[in-house]
Amino acid sequence: MDHLTMPKFGPLAGLRVVFSGIEIAGPFAGQMFAEWGAEVIWIENVAWADTIRVQPNYPQLSRRNLHALSLNIFKDEGREAFLKLMETTDIFIEASKGPAFARRGITDEVLWQHNPKLVIAHLSGFGQYGTEEYTNLPAYNTIAQAFSGYLIQNGDVDQPMPAFPYTADYFSGLTATTAALAALHKVRETGKGESIDIAMYEVMLRMGQYFMMDYFNGGEMCPRMTKGKDPYYAGCGLYKCADGYIVMELVGITQIAECFKDIGLAHLLGTPEIPEGTQLIHRIECPYGPLVEEKLDAWLAAHTIAEVKERFAELNIACAKVLTVPELESNPQYVARESITQWQTMDGRTCKGPNIMPKFKNNPGQIWRGMPSHGMDTAAILKNIGYSENDIQELVSKGLAKVED
């Protein structure tokens, strides 16, 4: 396979990934591949570009390092071109409503006829099969959270609240990335392709597993948090200091003992309710749970964040200031690790945002390109798979492809 023009870098150099999907979930999977060195082709509708393009800044992050192909993959010669592209593709990711591709004639079996080793990842809200009531429904972040039992666990004791920004989309995208790589590992052993069915609600069901297990195996459901505090454990969660907010985790035998001395509860250690060796204090089951919270709230409110961080560092209690977004860039840890970076957009502007993660030591990722324009790489991609200039112009004239203006 001849590759498109791009630098060679990262652990996935030489891999070809194609994705079809809009907004966040499916494209986030593609973005991860692109930042780790894969050649990633982003398929967009010919008439209407990805709706993410209306956002002024986010797509410059989420679509960097991509090659843009504008092609009607379901109709006539456009479909033929898509299937031709699949012959040299390692991983194909599609995000749609249920088995939308199969309904339009592009089944797994059709794809495998053109590439028996192809890894296919289907990403949808409710999966590729199930009941007629749900399978074909549209889904976004909040839908997946609501249907999975994840949303009902979040928010305050008085009202559930979805987790933002777009948690279900990002979790589902990462699931598609890891599942596709797992499948590719097996394909390279067996030579036989794989199809992966990723339902966003099942991803979020798994992400919400911690508290659910008590219900599934005992019938008790943990209540939602109160003012950002862990619903299970005292001394864990969000707390207010004299000049702002921190989060902390009061976990460990020594940590609890030393903290209790500071907040005036040392006399409770060694009691039947908080015996020696206690590593966590259950907010509900321990009768002293509310008292621990009361004393801790009072102590923290009387101290600044700097004082709390200094003292908790001495006691080895996990703690962090709740940073505002403007504080991120100047934070010394961010600076040392270059967590925020800059890159050039296709029109020459400077864009700033999160750097590539995680950091590979021997084969690091890199940002080599900004977000491509609609149809920017259509001609190059079609030429790469054997199409002539005349072939490409014919696709364009029939409205089956769009090339850059």
Swiss-Prot record:
GO terms for molecular function: L-carnitine CoA-transferase activity. It comes from the Bacteria. Its main location: cytoplasm. GO terms for biological process: carnitine metabolic process. It catalyses: crotonobetainyl-CoA + (R)-carnitine = crotonobetaine + (R)-carnitinyl-CoA; 4-(trimethylamino)butanoyl-CoA + (R)-carnitine = (R)-carnitinyl-CoA + 4-(trimethylamino)butanoate. Homodimer. This is L-carnitine CoA-transferase.
